[in-house]
């Protein structure tokens, strides 16, 4: 979904900070909006409230491509770095956007979780690294290192303002401008050795 677009609106509402979406230069929103720790915490809390999460717009073409992959028999997971307590509204959002067949997992990718929670939909990085993937979609340069753990995993880097200047780790990472390009890359995901 278009999470960053909504975070720009929330930053404007909460702090009168006006950073247009196309000018969000860093995945780290504290840095993009020049927030102090207290402001950043308030922004993250507001951005992950159920009433906000449920209003995020779908990225055009995403649910169609993902459902096509599921229909073709591929095993698809949505793995997010969202806070563990945002699982329920995130799951509801996915269901409302016709992605009810796709499991959702929250992973503490960025070391933000302060308490151990043993919900079945949470996982540690170690648990994530024990999984196997041959394709991933990622937009966070900070998460590239996590995807690198999966041998022969082709990665579609969804082109966003905050990753446009990021150097891609290797030729398994391919920049894609939209979900049509992501789907084409998926169809041709075999990595030649």
Where are these regions (language model features)?
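Structural recognition of alpha->loop->beta junctions
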Residues: 96-108, 131-132, 168-191
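Substrate-recognition "cap/lid" segment bordering the active-site pocket of phosphatases
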Residues: 84-137, 141-148
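Acidic, Mg2+-coordinating phosphoryl-transfer loop and its flanking beta/alpha structural elements
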Residues: 135-177
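Hydrophobic anchor at the start of a short beta-strand
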Residues: 75-76, 101, 153-155
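Short, acidic loop-to-helix structural element flanking the phosphoryl-transfer center
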Residues: 49-77, 84-91
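Active-site neighborhood of HAD-like aspartate-dependent phosphohydrolases
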Residues: 1-42
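Generic beta-sheet signal
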Residues: 79, 107, 158-160
